[in-house]
A protein has these predicted regions:
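Divalent metal-dependent phosphate-bond-processing catalytic cores, especially two-metal-ion Mg2+/Mn2+ enzymes
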Residues: 2-9, 19-47, 60, 89, ...
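Glycine-rich, flexible beta-strand/loop modules in the N-terminal catalytic cores of phosphate-handling
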Residues: 15-16
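Short gly/ser-rich anion-binding loops that grip negatively charged ligand groups
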Residues: 26, 67, 71, 87
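An active-site-proximal "capping" alpha-helix that borders the catalytic cofactor pocket
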Residues: 36-40, 72-87
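His-Asp-centered metal-binding catalytic motifs of divalent-metal-dependent phosphohydrolases/nucleases
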Residues: 50-68, 77, 98-105
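Hydrophobic alpha-helical segments of small multi-pass membrane proteins
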Residues: 81, 102-103, 125-126
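Membrane-interface starts of transmembrane alpha-helices
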Residues: 90-95
Length: 180
């Protein structure tokens, strides 16, 4: 099995620019992203860094939670990444990065545009959100290694708290970020 990747420079640069918005959840969110990116690389059989589109999407994929204070965070996250790509004249990445973000909570497998990156990213996020209960064939030992290298720092607890608050506010729409 591959060795975990220890640094994702593009992701870190983006997270640094949003550190104030993310606040005390920064380390937990960063480690979530690092776990997801490592699971993505393992699922794809990548050795080394994933492409720039993936690193950018990973940094922004849940960011709307903090910038817009909502669990319905996919549209705000796409808005933020669109502004980011525009400011760097990287418009050619918009479609793929948007698909990566918008479809990462899709309940069923993803088979549309950019499926070669979107589907493993969706699976990698699910591996992390499920705390490794869902593995998509990754060895349990690899998942545990990545989890120990990049500890939770309260990330899953924060998600549970936000989900409970969302359920109380909107019991008919408790998990707005999920897609069929």
């Amino acid at each position: 099995m591959m060795n975990p990747v220890l640094e994702f420079p593009v992701t870190d640069e983006i997270l640094t620019s949003f550190a104030l918005a993310i606040g005390p959840d920064l380390q937990g969110y960063r480690n979530h992203i690092y776990r997801v990116l490592n699971f993505y690389c393992a699922l794809r059989g990548n050795d080394g860094l994933p492409g720039e589109a993936l690193q950018i999407a990973a940094a922004f994929h849940d960011l709307g939670i903090w910038t817009d204070n909502t669990l319905d965070y996919l549209p705000p996250s796409v808005r933020l990444v669109t502004d980011y790509l525009d400011s760097r004249q990287r418009g050619e990445l918009k479609d793929e990065v948007s698909a990566l973000i918008l479809e990462h909570h899709k309940v069923r497998s993803y088979h549309s545009a950019y499926a070669l990156t979107v589907e493993p990213f969706r699976r990698a996020d699910l591996i992390d959100v499920s705390l490794g209960l869902v593995r998509f064939g990754l060895p349990r030992a690899f998942i545990k290694t990545v989890q120990s290298m990049f500890p939770d720092h309260g990330f899953h607890g924060m998600l549970i708290k936000l989900s409970a608050r969302q359920f109380i506010r909107s019991p008919l729409h408790p998990l707005p970020m999920f897609r069929w």
